[in-house]
């Protein structure tokens, strides 16, 4: 199953939220799932992707070009899709996944899931 995960790119969140992201990244492998996410290499996104990558999960990063240009992309992803904007990112993540999970985050995470 392709699982879309929405989570924070901020480094200013509670440490246990980083652990939750790492745990989910590892558990995706146990279930034989793939990860579709926002493509970031920082915050919960980075923790999620790093753990998933270490566990052998196939990763699809969907990230706006303006974040990629700031070197915020998790480059170890199996597939990196650059979008023009956040709206296109949300649309593609929805289309490329079978289900969605939201981890704790701020207003950016909330905006992506509504």
Q: Locations of the language-model features?
A:
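A cross-family phosphate/adenosyl-ligand binding-site feature
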Residues: 1-96, 113
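Short glycine-/small-residue-rich Rossmann-like dinucleotide-binding loops
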Residues: 8-9, 104-106
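N-terminal glycine-rich "phosphate-gripper" loop used for MgATP/nucleotide binding
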Residues: 83-84, 105-107
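Hydrophobic acceptor-binding patch used for acceptor engagement in glycosyltransferases
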Residues: 100
């Amino acid at each position: 199953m392709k699982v879309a995960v929405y989570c924070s790119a901020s480094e200013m969140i509670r440490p246990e939220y980083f652990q939750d992201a790492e745990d989910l990244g590892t558990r995706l492998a146990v279930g034989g799932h793939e990860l579709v996410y926002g493509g970031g290499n920082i915050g919960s996104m980075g923790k999620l992707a790093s753990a998933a990558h270490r566990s052998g999960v196939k990763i699809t990063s969907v990230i706006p070009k303006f974040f990629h240009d700031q070197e915020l992309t998790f480059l170890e992803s199996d597939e990196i899709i650059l979008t023009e904007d956040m709206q296109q990112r949300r649309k593609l993540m929805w289309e490329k996944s079978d289900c969605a999970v939201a981890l704790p985050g701020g207003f950016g995470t909330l905006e992506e899931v509504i």
